[in-house]
Each structure stands twice: as C-alpha cells, then as structure tokens.
Amino acid sequence: MSEFHHVSVLLEECLEALHIRPDGIYVDGTLGGAGHSSQIVKRLTTGLHIGIDRDRVALQAASERLAPYMDRVKLVHSNFSQLDEVLDSLNIEAVDGILLDLGVSSPQLDDSSRGFSYMADAPLDMRMNAQDSLSAYEVVNTWSQEELRKILFEYGEERYAPQIAGAIVRRRETKPIESTLELVDVIRSAMPPQALREKQHPAKRSFQAIRIAVNDELGAVRRVMEVAIPRLRKGGRLAVITFHSLEDRIVKNAMLEAAKGCTCPPSFPVCVCGNQPKVKILTKKPIVSGSEELDRNPRARSAKLRVCEKL
C-alpha cells in the first residue's frame, strides 16, 4: 500500500454527525488517505460514496484502501470547491451528506519533498496539486513586499509580518530563496530574540500563510460553503472540520447565514423579504477532540467540527 497514511481526526464524531443511511449518497471533499471514507463506505449497502482530492498521491492511496468497496465508490481528482461540477459530471442532483476535513494532511506535512515542513530541507513547493502553476517559490521570490506582508499578517496572523517580508525581499535580491530551510533562516533573521525563544517554531505562522496563499485555501472554503448547502437534500448534513481560526470563521459565518430566516427590520409588521432558514445548526459550539484522541494524535488539538442539517 502507498505510504500515504493519515490519522483521521474526530472520526466517530463525524460518522455520528453525518447520520449515515445505507442507501444514501455521501461526499468526502477532502479524501486524503480515506480514513473517514473507509468507515463511511462500510456503512453503505446500495448507497454511493464520492471521494474528492486535488492530490493524486492521496487518490492513489485511497483507491488502494477502498479497493474492497469500489462497487459503491467514485473517486475524483478535483478541488472540493468544484463540488457543483463534480456532482453534475456524475448526474447527481442532491446528496445526503458532505464531509470536509480542511487543512494539510499529515502525510503532506511529513513528506519533506513536498516543501510544507519547516523542519526538513526541501525545494519551496507547498502545492497540494502538483499540476498547479503557483508554488511557494514563486510567492517568496516574485511577490512584492506589500503582498508578502499582507499574507503573512492575514493568513499567518504573524505579528512580525513587516519585518519578515522585508527580510525576504532583501535576501532574494542577492539570490533566489530556493529551499525551506533557507526560508526558515530568513524568517529567523527578521525576528527579535524573545520571539525565537517562544515554544512555537518561529517559521510556523509564515509557512501556514504561504501554504494558504499557494493553494488558495480560504477561497476554496468560501466557494464550497456557497455550493455545498444547496446540494444537500432535505435532512442531509454538512460536517466541516477546521484547523485554524481563519477557516473556522468562514464556516461558522456561512452556516449562521444559511440558518437565518427573515431579515426584515423589526419595525416591519409582516415579512416582505421571504427569506426562509435553509439549515438548522446542530453544533451550537464546535465539537473538539477529547483527551484520549489528543494523546493518540496531538495534531487534533486545534480541530473543530461544525455540523448543519438541510431543512
């Protein structure tokens, strides 16, 4: 089997949230190594499971893991933000459940050749889909100082964004920044001594910011939240796991917006807008990992699961 092995986060909670019917149609928009999907398909008899991933390495690993169940599985190489197009291509109008496990999977982080990790030397890449044209190399070596400052601050919530952006531009004037550890060295050089003594790795926020920019991660989340709810049939559920506040804010606000009813001013005697709630939110507060899961998988610490049901 492929080396793409990923420990699924909030697995039991996701299965419960999706309320799986044996004859239902379910979508895993972030298939990865098929950890969640392998448990979903076991609960299907005449149903169908659609797995989507932009990473061909993940798709290959998933196809091996799901081989015994391929009579009820369709695997698609695409971005989850293209959900509409994927379902249209399969002539499927509505589904019973959609699962999204956002963020970078452990195998992508652990495979040093992909350039996601600040702990090992590799070419600056960070593309989840190797066929995409934009890589971390282009972002670091061609984007303006202001563009770099903006993504470091907005996507990485990095307080030293101006200093790091300036250091990147100065270094690349001498020679291009080509590897992950070169970039780590530049980031370290821009930070004050007290920041280097913090528990968190000094490059963590910057690498997150560049990865999000390279893969348009927040744009993809916004787009899928616009199309996912309309593609659920009545009683269908959307379950989304986020790993940082930027994603979580988008998901939370999209679900709240879909759960809104009338938006007329309180002074109006009767409703004239005609808006009806599209979903019921099933998680007043997001579901988080318990102590047992955190002991097994420390990367689950920042995971939050939000769930809504189509009305």
Q: What does each of the following model-derived ranges do?
A:
Residues M1-L311:
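S-adenosyl-L-methionine-dependent methyltransferase catalytic core, i.e., the SAM/SAH-binding region
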